[in-house]
Amino acid sequence: MREIISIHIGQAGIQVGNACWELYCLEHGIEPDGTMPSDTTVGVAHDAFNTFFSETGAGKHVPRAIFVDLEPTVIDEVRTGSYRQLFHPEQLISGKEDAANNFARGHYTVGKEIVDLCLDRVRKLADNCTGLQGFLVFNAVGGGTGSGLGSLLLERLSVDYGKKSKLGFTIYPSPQVSTAVVEPYNSVLSTHSLLEHTDVAVLLDNEAIYDICRRSLDIERPTYTNLNRLISQIISSLTTSLRFDGAINVDVTEFQTNLVPYPRIHFMLSSYAPVISAEKAYHEQLSVPEITNAVFEPSSMMAKCDPRHGKYMACCLMYRGDVVPKDVNAAVATIKTKRTVQFVDWCPTGFKCGINYQPPSVVPGGDLAKVQRAVCMISNNTAVAEVFSRIDHKFDLMYAKRAFVHWYVGEGMEEGEFSEAREDLAALEKDYEEVGAEGADDENDDGEDY
């Protein structure tokens, strides 16, 4: 088997995780208590969904996941929620005091105490796998736990499981909406280790997803539940081919191979279509060309950044439901003729497609309509640099005055780490600039020197 372990860190990671596991269970027909009426072979783990669920002798399906937070309130919601019987109690790890939006607390003081316990649990999950394929890591980089403990765990996973791929689903601070003053510090410090220790990172940002909910689903005031359900659809689409037997399957390592041209250039944009409410879906014909066009729309991007400002280096289209390769090829051919979707000159083809015949499921009583077919796109576009330059700018404004820095230094960090992380991000922005430059291979051959 090619198992995958999911790690959900901090409030954002846990709440997105909740939405994901709820959706996985619906897709596989697994009840909230872990039983699966349709699974006739009890205790035999040879089905495709066993990449994400392990099976006990009693026929209970347990997610291969751990939830970690430095304070108990969010995890207590999982412990008492409707899926409380699904998870093994040891998979829900919480500390007593939170990271207080402080990267240094999550990474050095408070996080250090809990990280060995987490790795211990990960080790147990890994021992339970026959051929561990990699990790999915869910966190936000604006807070303290997601950024600090998130980076710490990633660093330790690199040491313990060096060859296994790590995919991050990372929630970045939004341009306008902010939940903490020190977000820019936490994000810069955390991205510093995301650069080194993840193989692919998918950037999400709340504001972009709010806008999609408002515009496409007509939800006047979207809640985190609305956002997380939309995020979970994306993550579900990406992992469909790992959990179901499909037509054109896509492996986790395949994402890396097809999307990452240089090790550092691994921050992806994602989009999903059709995002449509039930009332509207009734009147619309959502054909393959239509949904394919929709995922390339700047307004469908799940991070606030305009792909028209950059160039595509690679792009992964994952279709699910009633889709045949002929339609996909036609739709992709149309996209290629469009002037709006520009590829870098050194990567002329740039499309990787996956098809899975399992139609998308929706959470009952949720916002999304039940549709026959859907597509999720993950793309590597040079415009992602906008996300970083935005955060860097805010970082610079605060750091010039050394505002709030004493909170970090007081938790055992050194001021040098700030400038080191900031320089790393400046280099990253430069890397993106060079990759998008025209005819890059002629003038400078130093692109491979990383």
UniProtKB/Swiss-Prot annotation:
Organism superkingdom: Eukaryota
Entry-linked CDD domains: alpha_tubulin
Native organism taxonomy: Eukaryota, Viridiplantae, Streptophyta, Embryophyta, Tracheophyta
Pfam families linked: Tubulin (PF00091), Tubulin_C (PF03953)
Keywords, comma-separated and alphabetical: Cytoplasm, Cytoskeleton, GTP-binding, Hydrolase, Magnesium, Metal-binding, Microtubule, Nucleotide-binding
Species per Swiss-Prot/TrEMBL record: Oryza sativa subsp. japonica (Rice)
Localisation per UniProt entry: Cytoplasm, Cytoskeleton
Designated name of the protein: Tubulin alpha-1 chain
Entries under Gene3D superfamilies matching the protein: Helix hairpin bin, Tubulin/FtsZ, C-terminal domain, Tubulin/FtsZ, GTPase domain
